[in-house]
Amino acid sequence: MGRGAGREYSPAATTAENGGGKKKQKEKELDELKKEVAMDDHKLSLDELGRKYQVDLSKGLTNQRAQDILARDGPNALTPPPTTPEWVKFCRQLFGGFSILLWIGAILCFLAYGIQAAMEDEPSNDNLYLGVVLAAVVIVTGCFSYYQEAKSSKIMDSFKNMVPQQALVVREGEKMQINAEEVVVGDLVEVKGGDRVPADLRIISSHGCKVDNSSLTGESEPQTRSPEFTHENPLETRNICFFSTNCVEGTARGIVIATGDRTVMGRIATLASGLEVGRTPIAMEIEHFIQLITGVAVFLGVSFFVLSLILGYSWLEAVIFLIGIIVANVPEGLLATVTVCLTLTAKRMARKNCLVKNLEAVETLGSTSTICSDKTGTLTQNRMTVAHMWFDNQIHEADTTEDQSGATFDKRSPTWTALSRIAGLCNRAVFKAGQENISVSKRDTAGDASESALLKCIELSCGSVRKMRDRNPKVAEIPFNSTNKYQLSIHEREDNPQSHVLVMKGAPERILDRCSSILVQGKEIPLDKEMQDAFQNAYLELGGLGERVLGFCQLNLPSGKFPRGFKFDTDELNFPTEKLCFVGLMSMIDPPRAAVPDAVGKCRSAGIKVIMVTGDHPITAKAIAKGVGIISEGNETVEDIAARLNIPVSQVNPREAKACVVHGSDLKDMTSEQLDEILKNHTEIVFARTSPQQKLIIVEGCQRQGAIVAVTGDGVNDSPALKKADIGIAMGIAGSDVSKQAADMILLDDNFASIVTGVEEGRLIFDNLKKSIAYTLTSNIPEITPFLLFIIANIPLPLGTVTILCIDLGTDMVPAISLAYEAAESDIMKRQPRNPQTDKLVNERLISMAYGQIGMIQALGGFFTYFVILAENGFLPSRLLGIRLDWDDRSMNDLEDSYGQEWTYEQRKVVEFTCHTAFFASIVVVQWADLIICKTRRNSVFQQGMKNKILIFGLLEETALAAFLSYCPGMGVALRMYPLKVTWWFCAFPYSLLIFIYDEVRKLILRRYPGGWVEKETYY
């Protein structure tokens, strides 16, 4: 009581602390979720279970009690995460990142116009136009980006489709169908093949029940479900069924132990929606760029503000100048350019099977330095295939070609005939109907993955399995179960009208225990020690390849004792199941996709670390990792070194092993420091038998190392990791809806190789955005300098606001976008991933090149044209200095030029606007050269060539647009742009040529002296 009372006066309990408390609370909850599932229901006996949930295990709950629990716990549904309202998303597009800069510009323009309107009788409307145009640019681009991204991000909607609609419960001893949302803890539920499990269940009885847990644990094989407690870990024990997994075959009854958000699936959902998502690398780059540009703008603005006060301008005029300079620094067209470039790349990636959900993720993929890939279905084909067989004391590779051209053994061997017969008959898998025209390997089957693999293998090498089964009809069968680990069936023999054959398959060591002889070259010989050793070696060799091995045996039943029509009893066995004849082994694997080894190799040369994270067995995981090159030739794990030196693993120095296979159970006990140690010191890592929460821990570990992490995944279990990663990649075909929602990108063909294509596109767009920005920024200098000289030298204004807009939003747009289509200069995939700390999109060197070098040459070209035109009209440069006040004075209609001619205000203005038009045309001419030099950053343009058709179109388009603006009748009234003499177009040509030569020489020095002074100062 005392503590509670004292709390009110505690000054420390401010709101800030509470805010912090909330955040800490959330972090604590997330940490809780990251831990493994804690429950003990799988360990309880049925009586204890009934007592715990106060339920009669045969009659179920009473209706009244179910109502009470429903009122207490709420419906059995997942809480949808807080979604961002659409208007907020739209506002983010309008006011995020780059747009802020343009909004500030627009507001400053309106401010300047307001000041002018208050001071002058007839204010010029330039600032008003500029403000309106800036606002329009932001709004149009914002709508465009919003439209591009509106097709995404609704994480939980997909969980909704996963929730089963109906459930079959037993209440008060009666079966009833109810809505799955009304299922409560303690309910007695029945599930059958084809159903979705309505909540987390503890099985109390089952008949051949198998569930598909792949979306939860990543195990592709259907898992048997029975009442026995088989494993400490609730995710692996047989007597628990999980919410929203599928029951594949059989039936089961169970007691509900968790509903809604408290289920294992619910925890994952909460985990995924509660994760903080970091900003994308490109968003940080654009922010950095805005800081740079704003810095330059404010520096110039303030310097000239002070200068104009010193030169004797009034305060208000100086403020107008300040605003004018800041606005002139804003690259109006760049926002649209960046958005369009990213969109184009996104479209290009979609054609290559990478569907990008938000535009910024396009570039993130390019800066990726670590890929954590799922094994099943991404690196492998997710189709079990027979890989090897062992018979006649030899290991043979299976031939999986359609035309059987790759046969590595003699198909006439009588042992092979016997083995193929057992594999075909002792097999419940069948092809689904109507697939006669599809190649065997691509046909859909009904049945378990291993049996389907055997079915396809035998169909390919021995012809129709259905006909084989018709010729040898089945008379009895014992299906596979986990206690005796074999499957057995008895068939009438086609080659003997009276007798039967018993065929059996199962775990190799169990099958061998039941055999007394072995079939070699078609003859039965006794199973001696030598043959048992041969079997053991073959079994170990195939198992070591990560393959799933099955043993096969048979027994020809004597027709005297078992004539046709004999009633075989599979419960009270009235036939022999011992002293059988062993025939051979067959091993299966989910083979790697064809394009993966090459893709992993490309990642390696691109400096990207590929880590395999799988729920599968370590041996299988390691075998596939070696098969696809994640563990490369000659690299050993600690276990390999120990085996080679014949010493215990504990004596091997872990630093000596380049590769490393980490078991999920070891990972569970590791501190984050130990995990960091592994990630730092091993180049090639495989995590096996991992849980969904661990995937998240691995991603966070990589991010602590400063890596930009891409994660692939297809199950619900992957969604937290997909969301946490810098870029989450979901599978389009096999992926669950949830994983697709959590991801930033979807692989339409589920192929790891497509990721590598995506990385290449991402790196290319980063390079090309640099080029686009360099091109766009350069014309800022010839746009700002006229204004500065107008202030300092008091000359008539050389370039007006309207003409600046014609450049930024007119002639420069298409060329800037065309650079997005530029091909890579060198092999992008041979260099290291970019370092986000040092390799920026826009750096000081790019600004110095654009503003300080190329921009200056462009400005000279513009001023040259300006002075030429005024001189031709009689105003020599010496006469222009200090003429501004008289020139802009409306009442002065007799201003003399250098030759004594008098000019009225209107005549002067026509000459001035003709100068604006010519200055504009000069900028277009020098931007030709700028566009061509921006094609490359290191290579010569002659090496790169002019293959970019869009770029050539851009050159023609900007020239045509400039000519149209100058010569179109009526432009003099609309935009105050006047027709030019043809010769005036040529004034800027020498400057254009100078830019081209200057830059080619710079790049030549760059290539000759890599790492030298020129590279340090000018290579952006």
Curated annotation (Swiss-Prot):
Segments passing through the bilayer: 86-106, 130-150, 287-306, 319-336, 770-789, 800-820, 841-863, 916-935, 949-967, 983-1003
GO BP, one annotated term: intracellular sodium ion homeostasis
Keyword Cell membrane recorded: yes
Membrane topology reported for the UniProt record: Multi-pass membrane protein
Modified sites of kind Phosphoserine: 10, 439, 450, 559, 587, 672, 826, 940
UniProt binding sites for Mg(2+): 714, 718
Region ranges (Disordered): 1-31, 212-231
Gene Ontology CC terms, in alphabetical order: cell projection; plasma membrane; sodium:potassium-exchanging ATPase complex
Main localization of the protein described in the UniProt heading: membrane
EC number, as in UniProt: 7.2.2.13
Subcellular localization(s) per the UniProt record: Membrane; Cell membrane
Region (Interaction with phosphoinositide-3 kinase): 80-82
Positions on the Cytoplasmic side per record topology: 6-85, 151-286, 337-769, 821-840, 936-948, 1004-1020
Compositionally biased intervals (Polar residues): 212-227
Chain positions with Phosphothreonine modification: 570
Superkingdom field: Eukaryota
NCBIfam families reported for this sequence: ATPase-IIC_X-K, ATPase_P-type
PANTHER family (alphabetical): SODIUM/POTASSIUM-TRANSPORTING ATPASE SUBUNIT ALPHA, SODIUM_POTASSIUM-TRANSPORTING ATPASE SUBUNIT ALPHA-2
Record text on subunit structure and interactions: The sodium/potassium-transporting ATPase is composed of a catalytic alpha subunit, an auxiliary non-catalytic beta subunit and an additional regulatory subunit. Interacts with regulatory subunit FXYD1.
Role: This is the catalytic component of the active enzyme, which catalyzes the hydrolysis of ATP coupled with the exchange of sodium and potassium ions across the plasma membrane. This action creates the electrochemical gradient of sodium and potassium, providing the energy for active transport of various nutrients.
Recorded family membership: Belongs to the cation transport ATPase (P-type) (TC 3.A.3) family. Type IIC subfamily.
Name by which UniProt lists this protein: Sodium/potassium-transporting ATPase subunit alpha-2
